[in-house]
Structures are given as C-alpha cells and as structure tokens.
Amino acid sequence: AASLGFSSVIVDDGWQTEDNQRGYAFCGDWEPSKVKFPDFPGHVKRVQEMGLKYIMWFSVPYIGKKSRIWESFQDKLLYYDGFQQAGVLDLRYPEVREYLKRIYKRAVNEWKIDGLKLDFIDEFYLRKESPFFEEGMDCADIQEALNRLLTETMTELTAIRPDCMIEFRQRYIGPQIRKYGNLLRVSDCPGAGISNRIGTVDLRLLSGETAVHSDMLMWHKEERAEEAALQIESSLFSTVQISVDLSTLTERMRKLLIFWITFMKEKAKLLQESQLQPAEPENLYPEVAADNEGERLLVHYSGKRAVDLRQIPKQMTYIHGTKAEEVIFRTPKG
C-alpha cells in the first residue's frame, strides 16, 4: 500500500473476534483476536515501519451478549437489540464513560495506534424501553452524556498523542462534531460514485478545515480501470479511502491508483484547502471547481457541459469525470 502512495490503513470490524456472523455479540471487551493477531503491538509496529499510519474501528455503543464484560454492564443499557445480540450502553452512568475512555486510551498508549474510527454514536438516544433518570447516573440527558464522553475522549487522547486521528461518518455529522474529531467521512455508499460525490462536497461545504474522507471505494478485480477511475474522480475533493485487495490488482489498475494518488498529493492544496465552487446542487453537483493562487481545477460529472477557456488563470486542469465521449470548449474569439 505504501508503495502505491497510501499513507494510512484503517482496520474495520473483525479485529476483535474470529466470529464472522452478523451482529455485535462479541463487541465490548475490545481485545485483539489472538488467532488473527498473536502479537498485536508488534503487528502495529510492523505496519507503521512500512510507512503507514494505523487506525482502528471501535463500535462505541454496543456491548455484546457474548463479551466477558457483559455481566458488568448488562444493567446499564439504553436498550437491548436482539438482532445485533448486543445492548446499547447508557452513557449517563459515569462508569460506562470511564470504561470506554480506558479502552481508547489503552489502544493509543499500549498498542501505539495512530487513530480511532468511532462508529455508531447515533445509536445513543432514548427508546420507549430506556430507563428514566436512575440512581448512579450523573446526567439526565443522554446527549449531554455523549457530549461529555466525546469531549473528554478527544482531550485525553490528544494529550497522549497530539496528532491522534478520530473519525466520524456523515450520518451524524454537523458543525459541532468538529470539536470531537478531526476526520469526517461520507456515510456508507459502496460502489456509488454519485453518492460519494454528493457526500464529499456537502461535507467540504460544512466542515471548515476539518479533513473530509470519501466512503471506501471498491470494485471487482475484473472491473475496467475506466470504471474505477470514475469512482476516484467523483471523490477528488476529499481524501480517498480505497477498499480493494491490492494483491489482486492488474497492472492497469495499479497504474491507475498510482496516477490518481500522485495527482491528489501534488494538487493537495488546490483540492483540499481551496474554497470549493460546486454548481447546481439540485442536479447533484454535476460541476465542481476550485481556485488557488492562479490555478484552477474544474471537474465535469455530466456530459454536454462547456469548459470556458475565455478567462482562465495561469494554469488550469480539466477533468472529464463522465462517460460522455465529447468535450465542449468555449474559447476566446480568434
């Protein structure tokens, strides 16, 4: 991955268990599987020595019925989800918040990971079966308790590691979420380049200087490189996450990834830091541009759109992010 230009690896659900069934029955202990990772700190170190940062997924709310810690917290739940075989922890209990913070601090302190992907925080809300304020709680409002957890987590993790990355995804993203993390990702949309485009542009417009990531791009190993390129082009104004088996890449796909990753790094200031100029949100942003210090980058995501060359800066890059075979240019007279 590092040789292709990637800088980080995100380890998703599954590192904590050998079980491959749906649900979260084994969440809660947050111990790396000894079968998969006999020496987890050593594994993290080896990955980092390859030049990659290491980010781990954690499901914040779920505590599984098959976890060892279940007995300690089964009476401190907002509700139990039979389908997921897991309960949603009630953050109004201070010992619940402290337990979660210890887990995250241990991951940074002992395992030396570079960041955390904190998932499913939108599950923290009251249901009909949720308890009212009870003895032992120090917050009446679950949202206030969540605010305490996330604020303290950010403060304590960055005290250990100032550059610690904390990711949240789009379904529960708003301006306030920026104080809890520093990496905002588009909500799940596998194989949907248009959804990734809408999500990344929306987040860029709302997230200030906070880093915006695409949802993971994926494709079949026999997919045409041109189809994969369209997915990447749809997420150009974000940090692109790729989820494919790199060992199965064809040479053409490998060259494709190297080209676009190199391009995005070379144009990082223009793509990531410039003020976006997206057009026609009612049409799903078919045109997006960015300008910076005499340079302009324009992407068209639908056909029959004109590239205006009558007033251009010193340098202009045009990207044809559509299957349309024609490109229309408007040039100065003469």
Walk through the language-model features, giving the residues of each.
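Aromatic- and acidic-residue-enriched carbohydrate-binding clefts of CAZyme catalytic domains
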Residues: 15-43, 67-94, 123-147, 153
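Catalytic domains of carbohydrate-active enzymes, especially glycoside hydrolases
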Residues: 1-18, 110-114
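Active-site-proximal substrate-binding groove within the catalytic cores of carbohydrate-active enzymes
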Residues: 149-334
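Active-site-adjacent "subsite" loops/lids of carbohydrate-active enzymes
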Residues: 53-110, 196-202
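Generic recognition of stable, solvent-exposed alpha-helical segments in well-folded globular domains
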Residues: 35-42, 50, 95, 99-102, ...
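Active-site and adjacent substrate-binding regions of carbohydrate-active enzymes
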Residues: 47, 96-156, 164-179, 236
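Glycine-rich, aromatic-flanked loop segments that form ligand/cofactor-binding clefts
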Residues: 6-13, 35-84, 163-168, 173
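Flexible loop residues that form catalytic
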Residues: 14, 121, 240
